[in-house]
């Protein structure tokens, strides 16, 4: 057996745990632990060994009672510092003794047992003494202070001292450890191996700086409050401060932690001692730390750097439970029993899941109990599952309990009510609760379908959204989180019912339109609206009122429904409230009144017109309900449209509308006017005929009488003249004889004098002449003698010179003479011969520039020798040329007339001597011209032998050869002209400045001749000498600016010389040439040189070019052109490059389009856009009648980039060509409208609108066409220009015979994919290349382009991959374009082409079948060639309804997400979609408001038509205006005169105001009226308001007791009410007063006139004054009468008529009429506010009546005295007048103020009338 020591060692080893560390614990020192265990073991051993001695020492304890023993143990506890435990023990003992069961003996025994067991437990180590006062062994009191060096304090501070020493050791290596810790390997250098060193106070700097410092003694626990201020304990004054000299290492900088110390509580030592803490902060180092690249075993498989540590829960459920228990124990220890934590109840998770699922549907369980007063579920405290804390489980379960509470409350809220007589909440609330119940049923289904195998967290997550909805619905229904029936502190508002409930739900849906509650609210709103929409449906469609609970908008008063006047309309059906929100929901607020009026109107129509079509119509009505489904919405809109259409059709057949009635009346009125005009014209014509016949008869009589008088006068005049002549002859015969004798004598004398004078003159002149002759002869002899030698010398030289000349002529036949001499003649020839119909445009009057004729190199490449140019300055205005060299002899006998063309029948000149001279001149010119082509002269001779040669003055003395030379070697020479020839030619030509393009074409030699011998009206097209490029208007490479255009003419074989612009030059502001009648166009026809850059060039207008060439182009090759006006090529049989109005390769902008015509086979020349250019903003062309279109028909260049192009409209193309394209080759086209496919039997390249090999997207399909003739583009065209922003010329394709090989859309040199596709041509294409109908491509096919949004046509190579095929948009329709052009027949060329290919129909069918069969293969090839990234067709997630996203209000459903096309979306899904896409107001408007508005408009229109058409409402208004407003002047005048005459006769009221008198007065007035025979006149009657006793004298309202009544029947009395008639009567009464005033003044006038006639009152002063008084009063009354007539009868009536034209329902008619009457009363000053003004007017009226009575009451006095007759009452009348004047001026002031203040602006009319001449203003 081992020794005791060995056994104790083994025991300690067995008890010691394994050597491992845990989180938050220090590493165990095994030696120290083993030592402590041994100490315990030995103590136990020694205690038992010396037990006897200890028992002897102890007193006898058994005799003491158990209570005393327990108190002794309590004292021991107090001594040990466990005071609370001692107190607790004493309390328990006292409670036990005080218990009722205390006398039991067992209690004492049990206490004894407990006392005996008191020390038998394991020894408990007392906690370290942290508090000196708490663990003091002096029980119950505190001992006096004994200094810092006492025992207790030293024991208390032992651990502090150890920590301080350790701190001093750590400070030395702190810097190195801090710097090395970041880069060290994991786990090295740390104070403990544990990861969380909670127990190590040295591991944290905060711990060192606070708890370990001097103030650590003052810190009771870790504090987090920043406002804590630590202070020293109270120390007595006599305390020993020696202990304060402890060296405490100062470690905290005072600025680092201001919350725990400040300068006030720092000791001097800690302030002054320098800090030894290193400056390097570990946290700063951690922030700036960069992860090491080192890898170690802890980081295998992890990237270097920081890694998240695992969560505590990852250690497992048991570890988490232990950790929770540990912390709960710590909390209980710290709280000391104050914190009573609930006892944890561990429940299995499966049971808890069952309880959770139960409580979600309101089922009580052990975990969830229901609090009945609060109707809320309560979670049992302490419930938890393994692996989760009770708090987390409680928070999760409390949420679930809240969901259950909401469910329970909503279930109680939505219980089906008992429908008895006490129920008053209405149908809307029932529908709402039913919708709520349905939602709760779906919720229960969700809960019950949840599998119980899910975890708590999963269930909580799954039901979070439903729980939120339940909570929201509970709050919506008023049964939310707060207790039911209370809202905060006050009572909760009652839940709305009826209409207010719908408004409440609608507003809530609007507020929640963007969250998850929106669909639930929409569902509840839809369900709740069902009863209301049913009520609205019945009320609006049929007028039926069904409201069992009185919750809707209308209340019925049955007693008023039996009335037949306005009360039926106003009181039969009444709105329940004046507030609109109380009557209708918010979403129908804007049509609430319309709904109300619509039902009333239908009931009125049923009552008044039971056979009305609205009452018996069987047209099905559209339903009214809240709808969120797209399909149903579309169906409702369709139903509304169908319903409205059918009802309008029924209305048209069964009734006449107001508009139709007005139209019929207008038509009848116009017909009446026409008949009246015809009758008037007939009468007028008869009158005019009669007048004309009378006038003619009278005129004949007058002429006859005049003729007789004239004859008599002539005879008498002749007789008198004869008598006078005889007298004159007798008187003057003797005088004549005397005058003749004197005249003869005088003439004889003058003759004698003249002869004498002439004899003297002759004598002296003869003498002087002889003297002069003698003198001259003498002088001549002297001079002859002097010059004899010189004369002889001169004669010899002259003879010698003549001999030399003769010799030279005989030897040399062609003398060298520069062409300048001959050229100088040309500008003078400005008038062409008769064969030039275009005028002399070849000879421009401006300055021209001449060039030396070095042109042989053009036609003869081998002779291209550079020659120096001799430019000649040309004078302006045809002055002739100043030659650079000296003058050469030119024979006088050679005139310019020899060069002029001879007429067709002219005889040859007989002067034989002139012929050699002309020959010499022509030979001289011909030296500088190139030789003609071989075979040209014979052809000329053989073709036109009878026609003499003509001279074309557009060139220099060039004979016109109307021949057709066969193509010979010259063609080869021309075609071989390459770039080297061009370069040599440019070198030889140089550059010159041009002043006029006319002379440029005129003065340059050119060959071969290009003018055909054409007479007027005749043209002989001949064959073309192809390929001549010899004609250029300017030297190649020239630079020309501002050159006027030439107009080349009649050139059979054009030359380079015909071009007015040099090749390669840069031209600006050049007006283009207009080439004409070019049978075989050449490069010479081009008005633009090759390679030049041109801007601002006006286009040429080429004409009649049978074979167009490059020369027809008005744009230079390769130039840069802007602002080019287009050409208009015409009648080109074989179009060529020359027909193009845009330069090849140019940059063109802003080009206006051309309109080419009749091109059978167009060429490249027909293109109005350069090849390869980039064109934008193009106006489209409209090509026409192109049988075989060509590249020239294209309105888009090859390789260009086009945007914003309007589509072309190609027509009738049997064999389409490239010319029909609307898209350029190689372009990038966007937004191009589709091309209309045409009747193309054999499709061509042009039929495709998609490039070869291009990627195409968004292509609108056109009709496929099939092409059997596929041309290969020839290789002679050159591409490669870029022209931005060009408006291209889009020519009309020109007529050209088929088979022109130069008709190309592409070239070999172009960068195109057609060349690559060449080998892939089908086999059948080969033979078709030579067929006559194979044009070169008519299509909109761009080579190498990238096209998007292009309207494609069918591919033109059926089997070629790289093209794209689309289906047809429609049969020949493109957009809204419609081809209105006639179907022109095919021309003869097409007929011959059709005849030459007999199997054309079979070929077409075969090619069609082949093309259809090749489409699929083509598409497959295309799909294989392009692998496009496509949208996914369907995903599983995409087949579900989409989650609402941010663009929900914006994106339509079609663009939101792609869904599986096989999934047919149900109505509910579309409802979800539509609620996402459309806002709620829009949905309500389209589902409810739309059918309501449609039917309401129908009903209102029917009611308005019924009243206006059937009841003739407007005729009643007019009758009221005619009679009661006195618009009928005859009626008003007659009525007033009859009444006032009886009144003025002094009749009493009884005599005047009886029915017989009044009826006779009225009937007489109606007989005088214009409208007395109308049926509405029978409604008039005169009635008495009251019977006055007497008529008041001078009272203007003497007849106010009388009124004119107008009877209005049902149902018109709804609109024309009694109140309206009374207002009419008020206006009538005032108008009657005006009539009384007029009658009184008329009576005054009558009396004054009668008195003046009887008493001769002309000289009376008073009479004159009374006339003036009467006149002023009459003016005033007439002003008021005119004002009333204008404002009431005209202005107000016109406004009323305009308003009636726009009324929509009966209410509007009623309002319009009431407003009309109100305006009439207001403008008539009959309102209460205008009473003061009316009082003034009444006073003035009484003064007028008073004036009358004063005048007629007494007779005038006798006319005695100087003042004439006088009236006795004149003073009274003058006083009345003065008062009248005062009142009228006062009225003027009052009215002026009213107008100025803007109160009654209509009174401006009154002011203008009364003060027209400023009478009142001046006064």
UniProtKB/Swiss-Prot annotation:
Record's keyword annotation contains Repeat: yes
A GO CC term attached to the entry: microtubule
Biological processes annotated in GO: cytoplasmic microtubule organization; meiotic cell cycle; microtubule nucleation; mitotic cell cycle; spindle assembly
Recorded GO MF terms: gamma-tubulin binding; microtubule binding
Compositionally skewed regions (Polar residues) per UniProt: 1297-1314, 1384-1398
Gene3D superfamilies documented for this protein: Gamma-tubulin complex, C-terminal domain
Residue ranges that the Swiss-Prot or TrEMBL entry lists as coiled coil: none
Region (9 X 27 AA tandem repeats): 1027-1269
Compositional bias per record (Low complexity), positions renumbered to this chain: 1321-1335
Residues covered by region (Disordered): 810-889, 929-951, 1000-1023, 1271-1412
Subcellular location, record wording: Cytoplasm, Cytoskeleton, Microtubule organizing center, Centrosome
Intervals holding Sequence repeats: 1027-1053, 1054-1080, 1081-1107, 1108-1134, 1135-1161, 1162-1188, 1189-1215, 1216-1242, 1243-1269
Pfam family, one: GCP_N_terminal
Keywords, alphabetical: Cytoplasm, Cytoskeleton, Microtubule, Repeat
Subunit structure: Component of the gamma-tubulin ring complex (gTuRC) consisting of TUBGCP2, TUBGCP3, TUBGCP4, TUBGCP5 and TUBGCP6 and gamma-tubulin TUBG1 or TUBG2. TUBGCP2, TUBGCP3, TUBGCP4, TUBGCP5 and TUBGCP6 assemble in a 5:5:2:1:1 stoichiometry; each is associated with a gamma-tubulin, thereby arranging 14 gamma-tubulins in a helical manner. Gamma-tubulin at the first position is blocked by TUBGCP3 at the last position, allowing 13 protafilaments to grow into a microtubule.
The family this protein is said to belong to: Belongs to the TUBGCP family.
Role summary: Component of the gamma-tubulin ring complex (gTuRC) which mediates microtubule nucleation. The gTuRC regulates the minus-end nucleation of alpha-beta tubulin heterodimers that grow into microtubule protafilaments, a critical step in centrosome duplication and spindle formation.
Pathological association: Microcephaly and chorioretinopathy, autosomal recessive, 1: A syndrome characterized by microcephaly, cognitive impairment, underdeveloped retina and choroid, and epilepsy in some patients. The more anterior parts of the retina, near the periphery and pars plana, have a grayish hue and diminutive vasculature similar to retinopathy of prematurity. Visual impairment becomes evident during the first year of life.
Protein name: Gamma-tubulin complex component 6
Origin species: Homo sapiens
Phylogenetic lineage: Eukaryota, Metazoa, Chordata, Craniata, Vertebrata
Gene from which this protein is expressed: TUBGCP6
């Amino acid at each position: 057996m081992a020794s005791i020591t060995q056994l104790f060692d083994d025991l300690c080893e067995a008890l010691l745990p394994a050597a491992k560390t845990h989180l938050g614990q220090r590493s165990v020192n095994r030696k120290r632990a083993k030592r402590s265990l041994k100490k315990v073991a030995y103590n136990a051993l020694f205690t038992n060994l010396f037990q006897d001695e200890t028992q002897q020492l102890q007193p006898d304890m058994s005799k003491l009672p158990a209570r005393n023993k327990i108190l002794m143990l309590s004292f021991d506890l107090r001594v040990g510092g466990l005071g609370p435990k001692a107190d607790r023990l004493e309390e328990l003992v006292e409670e036990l003794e005080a218990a009722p069961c205390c006398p039991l003996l067992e209690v004492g025994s049990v206490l004894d047992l407990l006392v005996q067991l008191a020390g038998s437990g394991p020894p408990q180590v007392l906690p370290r003494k942290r508090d000196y006062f708490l663990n003091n062994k002096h029980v119950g009191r505190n001992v006096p202070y004994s200094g810092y060096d006492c025992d207790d304090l030293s024991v208390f501070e032992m651990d502090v001292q150890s920590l301080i020493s350790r701190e001093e050791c750590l400070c030395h290596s702190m810097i190195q450890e801090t710097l090395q810790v970041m880069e060290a390997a994991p786990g090295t250098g740390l104070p403990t191996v544990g990861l969380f060193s909670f127990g190590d106070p040295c591991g944290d700097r905060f711990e060192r700086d606070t708890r370990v410092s001097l103030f650590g003694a003052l810190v009771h626990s870790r504090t987090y409050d920043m406002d804590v201020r630590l202070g020293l304990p109270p120390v007595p004054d006599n305390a020993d401060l020696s202990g304060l000299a402890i060296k405490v290492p100062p470690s905290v900088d005072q600025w680092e932690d201001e919350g725990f110390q400040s300068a006030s509580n720092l000791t001097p030592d800690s302030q002054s001692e320098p800090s030894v803490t290193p400056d390097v902060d570990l946290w700063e180092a951690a922030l700036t730390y960069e992860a090491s690249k080192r890898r170690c075993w802890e980081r295998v498989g992890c990237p270097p750097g920081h890694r998240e540590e695992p969560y505590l829960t990852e250690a497992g459920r048991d570890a988490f439970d232990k950790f929770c228990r540990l912390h709960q124990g710590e909390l209980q220890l710290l709280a000391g029993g104050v914190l009573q934590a609930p006892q944890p109840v561990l429940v299995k998770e499966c049971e808890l899941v069952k309880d959770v699922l139960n409580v979600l549907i309101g089922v009580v369980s052990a975990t969830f109990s229901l609090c009945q007063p609060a109707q809320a579920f309560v979670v049992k405290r302490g419930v938890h599952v393994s692996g989760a804390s009770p708090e987390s489980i409680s928070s999760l379960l409390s949420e679930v309990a809240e969901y259950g509470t909401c469910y329970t409350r909503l279930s109680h809220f939505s219980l089906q009510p008992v429908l008895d007589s006490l129920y008053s909440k209405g149908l809307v609330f029932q529908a709402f609760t039913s919708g709520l119940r349905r939602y709760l049923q779906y919720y229960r289904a969700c809960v019950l379908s949840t599998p119980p195998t899910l975890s708590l967290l999963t269930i909580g997550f799954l039901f979070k959204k439903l729980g939120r909805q339940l909570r929201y619905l509970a709050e919506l229904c008023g049964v939310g989180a707060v207790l039911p029936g209370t809202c905060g502190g006050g009572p909760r508002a009652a839940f709305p019912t009826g209409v207010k409930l719908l408004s409440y739900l609608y507003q809530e849906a609007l507020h929640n339109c963007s969250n998850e509650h929106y669909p639930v609210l929409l569902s509840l709103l839809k369900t709740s609206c069902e009863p209301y929409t049913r009520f609205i449906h019945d009320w609006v469609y049929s007028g039926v009122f069904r409201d069992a609970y009185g919750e809707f908008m209308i209340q019925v008063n049955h007693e008023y429904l039996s009335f037949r006047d306005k009360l039926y309309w106003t009181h039969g059906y009444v709105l329940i409230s004046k507030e609109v929100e109380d009557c209708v929901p918010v979403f129908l607020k804007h049509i609430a009144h319309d709904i109300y009026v619509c039902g009333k109107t239908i009931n009125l129509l049923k009552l008044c017109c039971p056979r009305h079509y609205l009452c018996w119509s069987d047209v099905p009505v559209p339903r009214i309900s809240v709808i969120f489904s797209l399909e149903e919405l579309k169906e409702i809109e369709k139903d509304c449209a169908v319903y409205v259409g059918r009802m309008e059709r029924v209305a048209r057949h069964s009734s006449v509308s107001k508009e139709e009635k007005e139209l019929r009346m207008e038509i009848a009125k116009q017909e009446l006017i026409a008949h009246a005009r015809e009758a008037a014209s007939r009468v007028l014509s008869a009158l005019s005929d009669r007048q004309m016949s009378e006038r003619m008869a009278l005129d004949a009589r007058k002429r006859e009488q005049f003729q007789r008088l004239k004859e008599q006068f002539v005879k008498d005049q002749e007789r008198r003249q004869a008598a006078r002549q005889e007298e004159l002859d007798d008187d003057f015969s003797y005088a004549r004889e005397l005058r003749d004798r004197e005249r003869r004598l005088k003439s004889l004398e003058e003759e004698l004098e003249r002869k004498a004078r002439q004899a003297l003159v002759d004598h002296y002149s003869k003498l002087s002449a002889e003297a002069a002759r003698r003198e001259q002869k003498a002088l001549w002899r002297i001079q002859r003698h002097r010059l004899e030698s010189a004369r002889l010398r001169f004669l010899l030289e002259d003879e010698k010179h003549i001999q030399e000349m003769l010799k030279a002529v005989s030897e040399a036949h062609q003398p060298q003479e520069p062409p300048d001499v001959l050229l100088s003649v040309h500008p003078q020839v400005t008038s062409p011969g008769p064969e030039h119909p275009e005028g002399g445009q070849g000879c421009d009057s401006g300055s021209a520039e001449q060039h030396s004729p070095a042109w042989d190199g053009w036609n003869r490449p081998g002779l291209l020798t550079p020659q120096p140019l001799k430019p000649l300055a040309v004078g302006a205005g045809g002055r002739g040329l100043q030659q650079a060299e000296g003058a050469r002899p030119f024979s006088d006998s050679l005139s310019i007339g020899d060069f002029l063309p001879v007429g067709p029948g002219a005889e040859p000149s007989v002067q034989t001597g002139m012929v050699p001279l002309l020959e010499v001149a022509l030979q001289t010119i011909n030296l500088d011209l190139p030789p003609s082509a071989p075979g040209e002269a014979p052809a000329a001779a053989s073709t036109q032998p009878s026609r003499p040669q003509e001279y074309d003055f557009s060139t220099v003395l060039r004979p016109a050869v109307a021949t057709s030379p066969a193509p010979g070697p010259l063609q080869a020479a021309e075609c071989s002209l390459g770039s080297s020839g061009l370069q040599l030619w440019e070198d030889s030509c140089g550059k010159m400045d041009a002043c006029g393009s006319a002379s440029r074409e005129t003065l340059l030699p050119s060959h071969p001749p290009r003018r055909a011998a054409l007479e007027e009206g005749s043209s002989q097209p001949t064959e073309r000498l192809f390929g001549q490029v010899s004609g250029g208007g300017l030297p190649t490479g020239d630079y020309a600016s501002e050159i006027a255009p030439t107009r080349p003419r009649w050139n059979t074989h054009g030359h380079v010389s015909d071009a007015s612009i040099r090749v390669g030059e840069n031209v600006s502001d050049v007006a283009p040439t207009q080439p004409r009648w070019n049978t075989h166009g050449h490069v010479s026809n081009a008005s633009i040189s090759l390679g030049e850059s041109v801007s601002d060039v006006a286009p040429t207008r080429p004409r009649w070019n049978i074979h167009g060439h490059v020369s027809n182009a008005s744009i230079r090759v390769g130039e840069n052109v802007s602002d080019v006006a287009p050409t208009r090529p015409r009648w080109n049989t074989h179009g060529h490059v020359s027909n193009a109005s845009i330069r090849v390769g140019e940059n063109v902008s802003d080009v206006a389009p051309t309109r080419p015509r009749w091109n059978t086979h167009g060429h490249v020349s027909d293109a109005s856009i350069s090849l390869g250019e980039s064109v934008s903003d193009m106006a489209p062309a409209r090509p026409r009648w192109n049988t075989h279109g060509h590249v020239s028909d294209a309105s888009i260049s090859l390789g260009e980039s086009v945007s914003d192009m309007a589509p072309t409209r190609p027509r009738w193309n049997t064999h389409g060509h490239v010319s029909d394209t609307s898209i350029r080759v190689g372009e990038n086209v966007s937004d191009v409208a589709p091309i209309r496919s045409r009747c193309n039997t054999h499709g061509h390249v042009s039929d495709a609108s998609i490039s070869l090999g291009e990627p195409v997207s968004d292509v609108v399909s056109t009709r496929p066409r099939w092409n059997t003739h596929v041309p290969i583009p020839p290789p002679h065209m050159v591409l490669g220009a870029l022209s931005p922003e060009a408006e291209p010329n889009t020519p009309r394709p020109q007529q050209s015979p088929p088979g022109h090989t130069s008709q190309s859309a592409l070239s070999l040199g172009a960068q195109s994919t057609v060349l690559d596709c060449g080998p892939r041509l089908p086999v059948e294409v080969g033979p078709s290349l030579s067929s006559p109908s194979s044009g070169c491509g008519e299509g909109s096919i761009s080579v190498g382009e990238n096209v998007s949004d292009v309207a494609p046509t069918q591919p033109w190579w059926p089997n070629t991959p790289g093209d794209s095929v689309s289906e047809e948009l429609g049969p020949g329709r493109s957009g809204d374009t419609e081809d209105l052009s006639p179907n022109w027949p095919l021309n003869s060329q097409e007929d011959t082409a059709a005849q030459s290919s007999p199997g054309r129909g079979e070929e077409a069918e075969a090619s069609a079948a082949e093309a259809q069969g090749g489409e699929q293969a083509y598409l497959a090839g295309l799909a294989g060639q392009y692998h496009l990234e496509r949208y996914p067709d369907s995903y599983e997630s995409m087949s579900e309804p989409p989650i609402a996203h941010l663009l929900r209000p914006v994106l339509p459903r079609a663009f939101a997400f792609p869904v599986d096309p096989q999934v047919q979306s149900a109505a509910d899904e579309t409802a979800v979609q539509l609620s996402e896409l459309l806002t709620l107001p829009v949905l309500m408007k389209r589902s409810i408001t739309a059918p309501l508005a449609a039917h309401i408009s129908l009903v209102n229109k029917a009611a308005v038509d019924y009243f206006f058409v059937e009841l003739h409402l407007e005729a009643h208004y007019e009758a009221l205006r005619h009679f009661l407003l006195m618009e009928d002047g005859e009626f008003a005048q007659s009525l007033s005169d009859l009444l006032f005459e009886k009144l003025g006769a002094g009749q009493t009221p009884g005599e005047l105001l009886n029915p017989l008198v009044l009826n006779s007065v009225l009937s007489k007035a109606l007989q005088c009226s214009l409208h007395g025979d109308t049926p509405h006149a029978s409604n008039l009657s005169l009635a008495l308001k009251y019977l006055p006793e007497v008529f008041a004298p001078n009272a203007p309202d003497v007849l106010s007791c009388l009124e004119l009544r107008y009877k209005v029947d049902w149902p018109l009395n709804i609109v024309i009410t009694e109140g309206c008639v009374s207002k009419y009567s008020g206006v009538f009464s005032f108008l009657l007063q005006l009539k009384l005033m007029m009658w009184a003044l008329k009576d005054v006038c009558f009396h004054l006139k009668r008195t003046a006639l009887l008493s001769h009152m002309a000289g009376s002063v008073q009479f004159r004054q009374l006339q003036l008084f009467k006149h002023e009063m009459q003016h005033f009354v007439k002003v008021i009468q005119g004002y009333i007539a204008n404002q009431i009868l005209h202005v107000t009536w016109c406004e009323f008529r305009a308003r009636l034209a726009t009324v929509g329902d009966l209410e509007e008619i009623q309002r319009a009429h009431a407003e009309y009457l109100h305006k009439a009363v207001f403008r008539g000053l009959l309102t209460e506010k205008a009473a003061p003004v009316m009082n003034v007017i009444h006073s003035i009226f009484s003064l007028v009546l008073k004036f009358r009575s004063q005048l007629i009451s007494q007779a005038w006095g006798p006319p005695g005295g100087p003042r004439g007759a006088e009236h006795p009452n004149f003073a009274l009348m003058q006083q009345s007048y003065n008062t009248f004047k005062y009142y009228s001026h006062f009225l003027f002031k009052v009215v002026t103020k009213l107008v100025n203040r803007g109160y009654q602006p209509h009174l401006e009319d009154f002011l203008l009338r009364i003060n027209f001449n400023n009478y009142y203003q001046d006064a």
